[in-house]
Amino acid sequence: GALYFFFESKAALFEEIVEETAEDLKRIMGDFTDQEKQLHPEEYDRILMEFIWENKDIAKILMDGAEGTRYENFREDACTKMEQILNERFQKECGQEVDHELVHILVQMKFQGYCELLRGNCSREKLLEISRILQICSSQSLLAIEAELNRKQ
């Protein structure tokens, strides 16, 4: 209770706790779109999941407890960024955009997988292994969608 006296509100306390982690997550997500830092998706996911593991408690409250703070749209903003990346990939690989609802659903599925890993109580090794397998599933799904789009052209 005494900690609240140093902050004007619960939201201000929350923001102080999550700010550094949130900014680091934004930077990591931004690195994925930076052409000069372009990584293979599996390597990107490994870096992201390592960071999340190292900051698990703060990442949990950022994803599930940000309502009423300036971070309440953090999850939606991250998903929007992922949707943009996926749309750009389809444009590059297939020369066309994919249905926006489909892209939205694919991103939500992947993000939900991250959140389930975050909420779970698994070891670092298991978290990284499941994340790696989820990335393989995601990549294979995208390849199948790209093949279908190219077949229809």
Predicted feature locations:
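Amphipathic alpha-helical linker/stalk segments
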Residues: 15-44, 60
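Hydrophobic/aromatic-rich alpha-helical bundle segments in the mid-to-C-terminal region
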Residues: 60, 64, 90-153
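Helix-loop "lid/cap" segments that line or gate small-molecule binding pockets
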Residues: 46-54, 65
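Helix-turn-helix
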Residues: 1-12
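Short helix-capping/turn signature of helix-turn-helix
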Residues: 7, 64-68
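Amphipathic alpha-helical packing segments from all-alpha helical-bundle domains
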Residues: 23, 30, 50, 67-94, ...
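Amphipathic, non-membrane alpha-helical segments in soluble helical-bundle scaffolds
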Residues: 11-18, 38, 42-45, 71-76, ...
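Alpha-helical elements of Rossmann-like donor-binding domains used by nucleotide-donor carbohydrate transfer enzymes
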Residues: 12, 47, 77, 81, ...
